[in-house]
């Protein structure tokens, strides 16, 4: 069993518990916003991630930091994270938050479209991608996760679940190369 699978298995019940709390208090969207913000913070700030992941740092120090960072967040979310520290599961926080967001998308009939482009997409281009994904998936909403990869040369790659739409120039060149080598 890989580490990622193990992390997902540990994270799933905690994410479901967090969703249950959020639903009971009608705070699902607020928790979603806070989860996205916290995930971005953990991704961008390696020192914070190292602090939270370090088993040698006292739980009280981690709790103090969580209280400081989440001073404006819902007390239910803050208490949930403090419980993760007590249960020594705070290491799984990114996976728990990602699982929560996946459950929230499922609840809201929203699909996640991971869009990779050669250059940053304009608002109009993002809207066009959103409309295309809505038409393909029949979902009620689309959540776009965009990233830039200049190796694509041009075009975009859209990934929704296990479905991938590759309209990048790099992908077209690769397909052309395969056809030429098979000829």
From Swiss-Prot:
InterPro entries: ATP_synth_OSCP/delta_N_sf (IPR026015), ATPase_OSCP/d_CS (IPR020781), ATPase_OSCP/dsu (IPR000711). Keywords: ATP synthesis, CF(1), Hydrogen ion transport, Ion transport, Membrane, Thylakoid, Transport. One of its GO terms (molecular function) is proton-transporting ATP synthase activity, rotational mechanism. It is found in: Cellular thylakoid membrane. It is a peripheral membrane protein. GO terms for cellular component: plasma membrane-derived thylakoid membrane; proton-transporting ATP synthase complex. The keyword Chloroplast does not apply. Its main location: membrane. Belongs to the ATPase delta chain family. F-type ATPases have 2 components, F(1) - the catalytic core - and F(0) - the membrane proton channel. F(1) has five subunits: alpha(3), beta(3), gamma(1), delta(1), epsilon(1). CF(0) has four main subunits: a(1), b(1), b'(1) and c(10-14). The alpha and beta chains form an alternating ring which encloses part of the gamma chain. F(1) is attached to F(0) by a central stalk formed by the gamma and epsilon chains, while a peripheral stalk is formed by the delta, b and b' chains. F(1)F(0) ATP synthase produces ATP from ADP in the presence of a proton or sodium gradient. F-type ATPases consist of two structural domains, F(1) containing the extramembraneous catalytic core and F(0) containing the membrane proton channel, linked together by a central stalk and a peripheral stalk. During catalysis, ATP synthesis in the catalytic domain of F(1) is coupled via a rotary mechanism of the central stalk subunits to proton translocation. This protein is part of the stalk that links CF(0) to CF(1). It either transmits conformational changes from CF(0) to CF(1) or is implicated in proton conduction. This is ATP synthase subunit delta. It comes from Nostoc sp. (strain PCC 7120 / SAG 25.82 / UTEX 2576). The lineage of its organism: Bacteria, Bacillati, Cyanobacteriota, Cyanophyceae, Nostocales.
